[in-house]
C-alpha cells in the first residue's frame, strides 16, 4: 500500500505540486512553438513523455555502471537514441504533424525536463520509480501544453483538433478569430495565467518576499 501511494505521488506531483513548466520554468520554448493546435501539442506530449520515461528507465538500470566523469554523455546518448526513434515513428505514421513539429522533436534532446529528470532522479532511484517519474513529468508538461493549445486554437481559429467549434464570420457565423492567439506571445500570457491560477491553488509555491 505504501509503495502504491508513493508511486501515485511520483506520478501526479508534476501536475500541480512540481510542474516542470509552471513551477520549474523548463521546456518553455516548445510550449510557445507547438501549441497553436491541439493535435501538435498532444503529439509533442506523447513524444516527450515517451523519451522522459524510457530515458529515466534506461539511465536508472545502468546508473551503477556509469563512470561519474561521463554520466552526462551517456545520458545524452540514451536520450538522443530515443528521440531518433520518436522522430522516425512520427515521420512514418503522422508525417503531416511531424512536419508541423519541425525541429522541435529533435530539440527534445536538449529539453531541460528530460535531462533534469535523468540527472536529478533516475541516477539516484530504482528503475520503476524512475519510469513513473518520467511518465509523470511528461504528463505534467503535457497538461500545460494541451491547456495552452486548447485556448490558442479555440480562440485563434474557432476550431479544436481542426474541427470548427465556433461558427466563423467568414462562414456566416458570429465568431471572429483572434489572430493574436496564434502568435507566440499569447502562449506566454496563457502560461502566466496558468502559473497564477496554480499558485492560488497551491500558495506554498509563491516565492517569499526578499
From Swiss-Prot:
UniProt name for this protein: Na(+)-translocating NADH-quinone reductase subunit D
Disulfides per UniProt: none
Domain of life: Bacteria
Membrane topology: Multi-pass membrane protein
Any one GO CC term of the record: plasma membrane
Segments passing through the bilayer: 10-30, 42-62, 72-92, 103-123, 131-151, 178-198
Entry's EC annotation: 7.2.1.1
UniProt keyword Cell wall biogenesis/degradation present: no
Location of this chain's protein in the cell: Cell inner membrane
